[in-house]
């Protein structure tokens, strides 16, 4: 069986496992106050060119989204997201569970449009009844998006400008951030994210770690953020588990080098599929490939290759997601191309 269902099929990079083993019997303080977390924070600040940033480690992506959003919104506010945003469709109502509405806008290749965002907020405040409505209090985007697409620096600057104008924090979900930064042709860097967002996170779960995300607040975390992490059940007593992993990932550029493997293998797959005449549902420059397959083709591949179901295209076709990762081998890629 060839596994291309997602980018978290594998465990962790061997260097992380080695460091976890080497440090296993060291006695350190808990809850993220250990020296490994401190070292990882400094390395992340340096990578972001943001020495004053507050860096917090959280166990997973949905936990990060819920806690960040809940910590930065007032009770009468909601968060604006693309209709295809992860918080809008694939987190089981986790944001709504905290009492905050997800206010959706149309997606454009998975992205929010700054002009539409400005129009939404301007229309809200122009309504004489807006005190009876959920206030747009924050903006959520992801990079890469659910479709593997990327924002340009200009697009981020435009969103940033709207958020500044209306005093709304801009939050960037970076569950797959490594793959976005490694993509060919991107003009967005970690330093840009530190400059243009109020909070973003660096995904580890999908980029080489066993688990964990590094949440970066360029201008400081909200008051009592750690307490909210604890309250939501996402504060690990053995915080070293996350600190060690990110310390390794941000040593000698490992996070960025392993991300490039996902891009290289995805590009080879795309070239192979294109040569065979396959239809692409979306042009993604990152590690996620979306193909439109005939249902009969999909049935024939069952038991031979594992893909992620995305959506029904029509009565006879299905959109599937094929994902590469930091660990995908080129021989697996060639085997899939041959199989297809």
Functional labels for PLM-detected ranges:
Residues 13-61, 83-88, 94:
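Conserved N-terminal alpha-helix of the aminotransferase class I/II PLP-enzyme fold
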Residues 71-89, 118:
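Conserved PLP-anchoring active-site segment centered on the Schiff-base-forming lysine
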Residues 74-76, 267-268, 272-340:
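Conserved C-terminal alpha-helix-loop-beta "cap" of PLP-dependent enzymes
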Residues 99-144, 151-158:
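PLP-dependent aminotransferase-class I/II
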Residues 102-103, 170-172, 280, 307:
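Hydrophobic beta-strand scaffold residues
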Residues 108, 135-136, 142, 150, ...:
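Active-site C-terminal subdomain of aminotransferase-like
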Residues 151-183:
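Catalytic PLP-binding core of fold-type I/II PLP enzymes
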């Amino acid at each position: 069986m060839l596994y291309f269902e997602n980018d978290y099929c594998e465990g962790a990079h061997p260097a992380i496992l080695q460091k976890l083993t080497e440090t296993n019997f060291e006695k350190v303080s808990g809850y993220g106050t250990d020296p490994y977390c401190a070292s990882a924070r400094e390395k992340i600040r340096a990578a972001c060119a943001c020495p004053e940033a507050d860096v917090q480690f959280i166990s997973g992506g949905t936990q990060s989204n819920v806690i960040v959003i809940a910590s930065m919104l007032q009770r009468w506010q909601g968060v604006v997201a693309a209709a295809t945003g992860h918080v809008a469709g694939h987190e089981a109502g986790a944001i709504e569970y905290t009492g905050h509405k997800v206010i959706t806008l149309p997606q454009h290749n998975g992205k929010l449009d700054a002009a539409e965002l400005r129009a939404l907020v301007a229309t809200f405040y122009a309504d004489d009844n807006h005190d009876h409505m959920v206030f747009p209090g924050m903006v959520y985007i992801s990079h890469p998006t659910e479709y593997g697409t990327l924002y340009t620096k200009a697009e981020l600057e435009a969103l940033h400008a709207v958020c500044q104008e209306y005093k709304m924090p801009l939050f960037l979900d970076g569950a797959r951030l490594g793959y976005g930064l490694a993509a060919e042709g991107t003009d967005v860097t970690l330093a840009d994210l530190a400059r243009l967002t109020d909070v973003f996170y660096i995904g580890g779960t999908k980029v080489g770690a066993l688990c964990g995300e590094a949440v970066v607040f360029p201008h400081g975390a909200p008051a009592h953020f750690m307490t909210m992490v604890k309250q939501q059940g996402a504060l690990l007593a053995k915080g070293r588990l996350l600190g060690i992993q990110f310390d390794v990932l941000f040593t000698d550029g490992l996070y960025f080098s392993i991300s490039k493997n996902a891009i290289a293998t995805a590009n080879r797959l795309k070239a192979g599929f294109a040569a065979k005449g396959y239809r692409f549902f979306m042009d993604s420059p990152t590690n996620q490939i979306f193909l439109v397959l005939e249902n009969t083709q999909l049935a024939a591949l069952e038991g031979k290759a594992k893909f992620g179901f995305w959506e029904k295209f029509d009565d006879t076709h299905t959109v599937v997601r094929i994902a590469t990762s930091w660990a995908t081998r080129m021989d697996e890629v060639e085997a899939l191309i041959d199989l297809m």
